Amino acid sequence: MITVVTVLRTGGGTYTAEWVNRLHAGVQRHLPVDHDFVCLTDDPRGMDRGVCVEPLRHDWPGWWAKQELFTPGLFDDLVIYFDLDTVITGDLVPFTGYTGPRAFLRDFFRYRENMIGSGMMLWMGDEMADIYREFTKDPEAHMRTFRRRSDEFTKRFMGRGHFIQDLWPGLVVSSKAHCRTGLPENARVVCMHGRPRMTELEPKHWLRQRWEAVA
């Protein structure tokens, strides 16, 4: 069974159950194969009925809550992860053929080509469990060392992994790098990163309207 998953750690002031529900609606519309939609969260209130809730077990702040995605035994088979500030704009079926072991985004900005992005990730079963095991040896030390970006910690485990943009050219795009004049042809996933957040865009902005129309 394919699992599509996201993470909602409350307390940051931006993300709420509304973001989970809109992402869920986009996935439901564009993934016409059997799958579960799971949200790891510390507050399940307000989530749509079709969202399977998995409680966050640790009090790791902000983006560090993503490390719980890699908990051994949490998922079987193919896992597709999306950040909450992701807009699903087309058919997701091409991603369902991935057989592992793990795939990350290549950072969208040329000057950081050697960095990964974790706004979308794919992996099989426990293929990412090594990340969790290493992090849980000393979470406080890792959060101090990699305090600017959890992706810097995750990059150490790229190993035999793939870059998503190499596997599916043009299907996953950046709102900042690729969408200034509209949605690129064949784009299936739009990743927003940094500011402006979706809710900070003008109400008439085409991407915000597309995001709001999906639910």
What is the predicted function of each stretch?
Residues 1-61, 74-75, 194-197, 212-215:
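N-terminal anchoring/stem segment of glycosyltransferases
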Residues 33-42, 79-86, 102-105, 163-164, ...:
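Short, hydrophobic beta-strand segments that form beta-sheet elements in well-ordered domains
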Residues 37-46, 86-93, 151, 168, ...:
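Short, polar loop motifs at secondary-structure junctions
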Residues 45-55, 65-115:
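GT-A fold catalytic core of metal-dependent nucleotide-sugar glycosyltransferases
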Residues 58-65, 149:
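A short, glycine-/small-residue-rich helix N-cap motif at loop->alpha-helix starts
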Residues 71, 122-124, 191:
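Short, well-ordered beta-strand micro-motif
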Residues 92-156:
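Conserved catalytic core of nucleotide-sugar-dependent glycosyltransferases
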Residues 129-215:
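Catalytic core and acceptor-binding pocket of nucleotide-sugar-dependent glycosyltransferases
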